[in-house]
């Protein structure tokens, strides 16, 4: 049902998504839907939270599996994963659709705010892992850096490809480097 809902959102948008169509696509009854979710909004928040939790868990595992104290190697591995994630625009589109839905629907906005707060905490934990592991001295607290990383990712997703800009993964790693007080790499000459 989650996969069918996700596909519906990406194809039609949140406003056009119907529980009946989701259930039909998933091969379930509407009763099955309501035995798992109180409303369409609950489903929407669940979809986004579960994806972000899975992704942050994967990123934290990547950090934990990196050997040694070479932050550059760790950032390179994280950038590789972020580049792969950027190739899956449906997740960024989903997040943007939900943000727009929250802006238009006050009842959903509160649930969405709670869901985003959980996501920010998860990103903050990832940043805290890096700070501890490499004894970094960040410019902002870990959760605030996580909020900034998430906002930057979403903003870049909305922008799409920008002529002359570096890739999303390079931009995120550059932002993290700046926030972590790491040496900033010289910008490439055009």
Regions found by a protein language model. Give the residues of each.
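Generic hydrophobic, amphipathic alpha-helix propensity
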Residues: 1-6, 22, 47-51, 55, ...
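Solvent-exposed, amphipathic alpha-helical segments
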Residues: 4-12, 58-62, 94-98, 152-159
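Hydrophobic alpha-helical connector segments
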Residues: 46, 60-91, 142-149
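Amphipathic alpha-helical packing segments from all-alpha helical-bundle domains
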Residues: 56-57, 61, 87-96, 106-133, ...
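Helix-loop "lid/cap" segments that line or gate small-molecule binding pockets
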Residues: 80-86, 94-104, 178
């Amino acid at each position: 049902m989650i996969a069918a809902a996700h596909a519906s959102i990406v194809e039609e948008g949140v406003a056009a998504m119907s529980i009946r169509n989701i259930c039909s696509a998933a091969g379930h009854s509407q009763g099955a839907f309501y035995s798992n979710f109180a409303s369409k909004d609950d489903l929407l928040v669940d979809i986004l939270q579960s994806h972000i939790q899975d992704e942050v868990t994967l990123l934290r595992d990547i950090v934990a599996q990196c050997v040694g104290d070479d932050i550059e190697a760790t950032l390179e591995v994280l950038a590789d994963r972020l580049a792969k994630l950027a190739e899956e625009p449906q997740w960024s589109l989903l997040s943007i659709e939900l943000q727009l839905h929250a802006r238009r629907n006050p009842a959903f906005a509160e649930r969405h705010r709670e869901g985003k707060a959980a996501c920010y905490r998860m990103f903050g934990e990832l940043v805290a892992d890096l700070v501890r592991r490499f004894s970094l001295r960040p410019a902002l607290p870990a959760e605030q850096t996580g909020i900034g990383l998430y906002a930057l990712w979403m903003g870049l997703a909305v922008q799409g490809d920008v002529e002359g800009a570096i890739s999303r993964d390079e931009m995120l790693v550059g932002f993290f480097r700046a926030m972590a007080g790491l040496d900033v790499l010289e910008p490439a000459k055009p």
